[in-house]
Regions:
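Short, Lys/Arg-enriched N-terminal segments with co-localized hydrophobic residues
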Residues: 1-5
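Conserved N-terminal subdomain of the carbohydrate kinase-like
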Residues: 7, 16-27, 42-120, 124-135, ...
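Active-site metal-binding loops of divalent metal-dependent hydrolases
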Residues: 12-14, 224
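Alpha-helix C-terminal capping segments
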Residues: 37-46, 232-234
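Short beta-strand scaffold segments in enzyme catalytic cores
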Residues: 38, 80-83, 196-200
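Short, conserved phosphate/pyrophosphate- and ester-handling motifs at nucleotide-, phospho-/glycolipid
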Residues: 40, 171, 222
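Conserved beta-alpha-beta core of the PfkB/ribokinase-like small-molecule kinase fold
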Residues: 114-184, 196
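Conserved phosphate-binding/catalytic region of the ribokinase-like
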Residues: 154, 180-279
Length: 279
């Protein structure tokens, strides 16, 4: 996979995460867009379209090292407080919210990932993205989260504006909040943390089993999975992309970085089970 050939865009707020574990508090860069960029930067030249007022200089430098950074002006920076109850369960609270993303760069891309954290991507931007790239992926989560500060709330929403996407990722628990049928998108990826997930290609169902990884935390897993799947799907068929994305995500969880070889990903992908379901 040649880095530098493809031009891709990731849209969404990067986030200042305040993480509480017991009495310890740490601050770090987060947000679905950040984790998707981390993965996608392994496949293509990435542009990041985001919005914030201020972030620590080293975080901005990290974003710039991953791709071309475009920051829309905002009075606020999106910030969450994550309180870990155990490695897979956390309580999430929205502290502040940056400005919405109301325009895309005026050019074409090979792929665009729309990964909002709390409703910062309007419906017309989704429609515009579909005209700007042949492969458009999105994560459902940020489209059904309330932008109101306080404990994170999911809102029921008619998500028919996502129709026509190449790839839509969602957590199995989130799907009931959105009216999305598997036939309305090319590929629908439903994950359930470390448990088996479901994927649909043109409405046909498959079951896939993520690789077991002992992890201290799972933050960013779904966003890395979406970023990696998008990267592979630019050049590989559906099932191969699914297996490789699952392997890529397992290695990310193990290392908490994407600094591993693609040979290792391809080797590990052979251990991922994907089976067609008859329903």
């Amino acid at each position: 996979l040649g880095r530098g050939k493809m031009k891709c865009l990731v849209v969404g707020h990067v986030v200042r995460d305040l993480i509480r574990r017991g009495s310890k508090i740490e601050e770090r860069l987060g947000g679905g867009a950040y984790y998707s960029v981390l993965a996608l930067s392994r496949f293509c030249d990435v542009e990041i379209l985001t919005s914030f007022s201020q972030l620590p200089e080293e975080w901005v430098e990290e974003l710039r090292s991953l791709g071309k950074l475009t920051v829309l002006p905002s009075d606020e920076t999106t910030s969450y407080e994550l309180t870990y109850l155990d490695s897979n369960r956390r309580e999430l609270k929205l502290i502040s919210h940056a400005s919405p993303i109301t325009e895309l760069p005026a050019r074409k891309y090979d792929a665009i990932i729309l990964n909002p954290v709390a409703n910062e991507i309007p419906e017309d931007i989704v429609r515009e993205a579909l005209n700007r790239a042949k492969l458009v992926s999105a994560d459902l989560q940020g489209f059904i989260r309330s932008p109101r500060p306080g404990p994170v709330e999911l809102i029921r929403r008619d998500c028919s504006f996502l129709k026509g996407l190449s790839v839509l990722h969602a957590d199995i628990a989130e799907l009931p909040y959105a009216k999305v049928s598997p036939n309305s998108v090319e590929s629908l990826l439903l994950t359930d943390g470390p448990n088996p997930g479901k994927a649909y290609l043109h409405g046909r169902p498959y079951r896939f089993v993520p690789l077991k990884v002992e992890v201290g935390e799972s933050t960013g897993a779904g966003d890395v999975f979406l970023g990696a799947f998008t990267g592979f799907y630019l050049e590989c068929p559906f099932i191969q992309s699914l297996k490789r994305a699952a392997a890529f995500t397992a290695l990310f969880l193990k290392h908490r970085s994407v600094e591993f070889g693609m040979d290792e990903v391809n080797e590990l992908a052979r251990k991922v089970t994907v089976e067609a379901l008859s329903e």
